[in-house]
Every structure is written in C-alpha cells, then in structure tokens.
C-alpha cells in the first residue's frame, strides 16, 4: 500500500516531538536527582545517619545520571542519523 506524500514529514515531526519530550524528561530527572541528592546529604549530616545511607544515596543518584546520559546519547545518535539521511 502506498504511503501518503506527507507521511515521511509527519513521521520526522513526530520523532522530533518525541525527542523533545524525552529531553524534557531527562532534564527533570537530572534536576530532581540533584535536589534529592543534596537534600539527603544535608539531612544525613544533620541527623548523623551512618555513612552507608550516604553511599546508598550516591549510588541512586549515579544510577539516575547514567540513565539520563544513556537517553541523551540515544537521542543524539537518532538526530545524527536522521540529519545524515539514514533515519
């Protein structure tokens, strides 16, 4: 079945919109991660929590930041491929 002429353009626009949504999600995850990480570090210092809880907060923050980096890398690769006419 033949595709409508505007199908490729609408698909590219949909990909750009999806990329924009994902980048907003990445930005929110980074901002919330940093705020929570700083808050937990401060609260742990005030309440004299054991160091294991600080390390747990560090690992959770590292996990969120690695996820953000991977999603950003995927978006970058997808945009690079589409700008070179491969996607």
From Swiss-Prot:
Localization per Swiss-Prot or TrEMBL? Cell membrane
What does the record say about its membrane topology? Multi-pass membrane protein
Keyword annotations of the record? Cell membrane, Membrane, Transmembrane, Transmembrane helix
What is a single cellular component term in the Gene Ontology annotation? plasma membrane
For whether the record's keyword set contains Oxidoreductase, the answer is: no
Q: Which InterPro entries match?
A: Uncharacterised_Ynq1 (IPR020308)
Name the domain of life. Answer: Bacteria
Establish whether keyword Transmembrane is in the entry.
yes
| TM stretches of this protein | 25-45, 53-73
Name this protein carries in UniProt: Uncharacterized 9.3 kDa protein in nqo2 3'region
């Amino acid at each position: 079945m033949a595709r409508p002429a505007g199908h490729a353009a609408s698909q590219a626009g949909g990909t750009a919109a999806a990329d924009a949504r994902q980048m907003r999600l990445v930005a929110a995850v980074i901002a919330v991660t940093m705020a929570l990480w700083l808050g937990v570090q401060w609260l742990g210092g005030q309440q004299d929590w054991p160091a294991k809880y600080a390390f747990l907060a560090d690992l959770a923050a590292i996990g969120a930041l690695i996820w953000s980096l991977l999603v950003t890398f995927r978006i970058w690769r997808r945009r690079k491929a589409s700008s070179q006419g491969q996607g």
